[in-house]
């Protein structure tokens, strides 16, 4: 593949001589037949020393390399380039005789079903979808077209997944929500009889669990991307194009709007509303609803400017405490002297 081929595939302008490209790498590690990219200005000094055959850059830096692909969004276009070089997922094709497919299940054309997959009654698998070994698709489930379910993904009964979704290993959709009642007879389970729906173009990271609703539907909106080890409680609604980073926990019946970003280890209490375009910093604890467009951080979470001022003050607290104690003692001494004088 030549640089001109990549430029044509991505619709980018080529500056400089055309070259052969055999792979993709970082600026530092790239060899003379690899393409790289510059998205972060702090790596500009690496342009002078890179051995890369070509670099995807914004127009302002194109003059610093011999061969450049000029991009308005170098990181995004680098991702598109990776698709051109990505290795095929597995060598198997077709439907394995060692998969169990219920007679009432429907399998679309061009699907790949690996050995040891289970597909239950009335389940539907859309065209071009791949299920790797160990996947479980329960009865009445529906998986859309061109989806990729990595090994050991579990879809419990009546779960629905849209088109172009990627579910990484260990994902569980539709397990019972954490519903229990304390009674005089002990802790009693509340049956969870709802389901989970995942929209189109959703990616869910390894070992993430999204619980079925008590009644109704737990919903993940179109275009949302979730990292590994995320927990979504029953009856949660997550909007479109959200980014949910690792170890986030969202408690039951909370509504998350569109384009929300939650950094790692955010905890969200139940029955809240998180507005559109909210950003929440890492390790934050959300205990109340948040208006659209806010940036929050801390435990409990407050608006970013308040949180940053708090972080600035916290290292000074031990010294401030010592000074306060000293002032208190001096004040007590002055009171004592004043009492003796009277």
From Swiss-Prot:
GO MF annotations in UniProt: N-acyltransferase activity
GO biological process: lipid A biosynthetic process
Keywords assigned by UniProt, alphabetized: Acyltransferase, Lipid A biosynthesis, Lipid biosynthesis, Lipid metabolism, Repeat, Transferase
A GO CC term assigned to this protein in UniProt: membrane
Catalytic function, reaction form: a UDP-3-O-[(3R)-3-hydroxyacyl]-alpha-D-glucosamine + a (3R)-hydroxyacyl-[ACP] = a UDP-2-N,3-O-bis[(3R)-3-hydroxyacyl]-alpha-D-glucosamine + holo-[ACP] + H(+)
Active site: 234
Pathway: Bacterial outer membrane biogenesis; LPS lipid A biosynthesis
EC annotation from Swiss-Prot or TrEMBL: 2.3.1.191
Job description of the protein: Catalyzes the N-acylation of UDP-3-O-acylglucosamine using 3-hydroxyacyl-ACP as the acyl donor. Is involved in the biosynthesis of lipid A, a phosphorylated glycolipid that anchors the lipopolysaccharide to the outer membrane of the cell.
Homology family: Belongs to the transferase hexapeptide repeat family. LpxD subfamily.
NCBIfam families for this protein: lipid_A_lpxD, PRK00892.1
Oligomeric form and interacting partners: Homotrimer.
The protein's name in its UniProt record: UDP-3-O-acylglucosamine N-acyltransferase
The encoding gene: lpxD
């Amino acid at each position: 593949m030549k640089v001109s081929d990549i430029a044509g595939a991505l619709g980018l302008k080529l500056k400089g001589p055309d070259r052969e490209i055999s792979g993709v790498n970082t600026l530092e590690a790239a060899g003379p037949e690899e393409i790289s990219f510059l998205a972060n200005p702090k790596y500009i000094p690496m342009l002078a020393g890179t051995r890369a055959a070509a670099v995807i850059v914004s127009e302002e830096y194109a003059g610093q390399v011999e061969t450049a692909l000029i991009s308005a969004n170098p990181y995004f276009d680098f991702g598109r380039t990776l698709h051109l070089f990505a290795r095929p997922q597995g060598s198997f094709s077709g439907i394995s005789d060692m998969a169990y497919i219920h007679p009432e299940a429907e399998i679309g054309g061009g699907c790949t079903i690996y050995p040891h997959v289970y597909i239950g009654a009335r389940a539907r698998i859309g065209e071009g979808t791949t299920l790797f070994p160990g996947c479980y698709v329960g009865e009445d489930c529906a998986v859309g077209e061109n989806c990729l379910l990595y090994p050991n993904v579990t879809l419990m009964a009546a779960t629905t997944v849209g088109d172009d979704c990627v579910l990484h290993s260990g994902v569980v959709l539709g397990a019972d929500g954490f519903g229990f009642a304390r009674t005089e007879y002990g802790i009693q389970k509340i049956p969870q009889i709802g389901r989970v729906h995942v929209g189109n173009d959703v990616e869910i990271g390894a070992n993430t669990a999204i619980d079925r609703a008590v009644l109704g539907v737990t919903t993940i909106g179109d275009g949302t991307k979730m990292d590994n080890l995320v927990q979504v409680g029953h009856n949660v609604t997550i909007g479109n194009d959200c980014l949910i980073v690792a170890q986030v926990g969202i408690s039951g019946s909370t509504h998350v709007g569109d384009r929300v970003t939650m950094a790692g280890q955010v905890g969200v209490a139940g029955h809240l509303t998180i507005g559109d375009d909210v950003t929440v910093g890492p390790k934050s604890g959300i205990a109340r609803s948040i208006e659209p467009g806010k940036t929050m951080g801390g435990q409990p979470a407050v608006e970013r400017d308040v949180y940053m001022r708090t972080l600035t003050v916290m290292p000074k607290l031990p010294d401030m405490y010592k000074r306060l104690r000293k002032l208190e003692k001096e004040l007590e001494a002055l009171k004592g002297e004043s009492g003796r004088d009277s």
